[in-house]
Curated annotation (Swiss-Prot):
Gene3D superfamilies: 3.40.50.1860. This is Glutamate racemase. It comes from the Bacteria. PANTHER family: GLUTAMATE RACEMASE. Pfam families: Asp_Glu_race. It comes from Ectopseudomonas mendocina (strain ymp).
């Protein structure tokens, strides 16, 4: 098989990375995609870095065995915990990670107050601290860990009253502090944008990094002469959690039905 027609492997702690997969599809419609949801171990945000690294190596090995030509860590927590080790272990493999959009948010804010919704793991990471030091020295950044939100999205409860109540509790303190720019620092959270728009004023910008990750993948594949030129094959999905549940949320999150395999 021509290496440029090989698939790109994408993975996340659960279904959140599908928000990134959606952006990759839009920008790179010829790329065939493989997706692993590690839903049997979700959420990563509450796990140790060592545990997350072990999971990431297992998943990467699986994706390489399926012929992946590149890897997208569609998870902020996994990137913070494991990207450096994966790049060291697989030096020939183009790897794209993700980080909360601190730089664009610091540039966008008018009030000088930026809110960050993320998992505990991302907010505690050295990588996040370094991002704040580098890009947010002139703005006030208020971080808000969001336990429970990932689980709501995994269950497909995007508009449920309980999800709304939880999200409102996380967002209101940020708005009270004058925050006008909200970073969605977890790939699950873009699926809550419709709900968020109903909870925050129109003047508040919501910033996530899915599109930026797709552009970085495009750059890396181009550098390695790996951009696909033929139409994509159907996306293949795996989950380490409840297969039926993932099959049920795919139409909600991506508008498609697909078979999910056991990982």
């Amino acid at each position: 098989m021509n290496q440029s027609q090989a698939p790109v492997g994408v993975f996340d702690s659960g279904v959140g990375g599908l928000s990134v997969l959606r952006e990759i599809r839009q920008l790179l419609p010829n790329e065939s995609l493989l997706y692993v949801a590690d839903s049997g171990h979700v959420p990563y945000g509450e796990k140790s870095a060592e545990y997350i690294r072990e999971r990431c190596v297992l998943i990467t090995e699986h994706l390489l065995a399926q012929g992946a030509k590149a890897l997208v860590l569609a998870c902020n927590t996994a990137t913070a915990a494991a990207a450096a080790e994966l790049r060291e272990r697989y030096p020939q493999l183009p790897i794209v990670g993700m980080e909360p959009a601190v730089k664009p948010a610091a540039a966008a804010t008018r009030s000088g107050v930026v809110g960050v919704l993320a998992t505990t793991g991302t907010l505690k990471s050295a990588k996040f601290a370094a991002l704040l030091d580098r890009f947010a020295s002139d703005v006030r950044v208020i971080t808000q860990p969001c336990p429970g939100l990932v689980e709501c999205i995994e269950a497909g409860a995007l508009q449920a009253p309980a999800t709304r109540e939880l999200l409102q509790g996380y967002v209101e303190p940020l708005l009270a502090e004058g925050c006008d720019t909200l970073i969605l620092g977890c790939t699950h959270y873009p699926f809550l944008k419709p709900l968020l728009h109903s909870l925050v004023p129109d003047s508040v910008s919501l910033i996530d990094t899915g599109a930026a990750v797709a552009r970085q993948l495009q750059r890396l594949l181009g550098q390695h002469e790996l951009l696909a030129t033929q139409p994509a094959q159907a996306t293949r999905y795996w989950s380490s959690g409840d297969i039926q549940r993932m099959q049920a949320v795919l139409p909600l999150l991506l508008g498609e039905q697909a078979q999910v395999h056991v990982f």
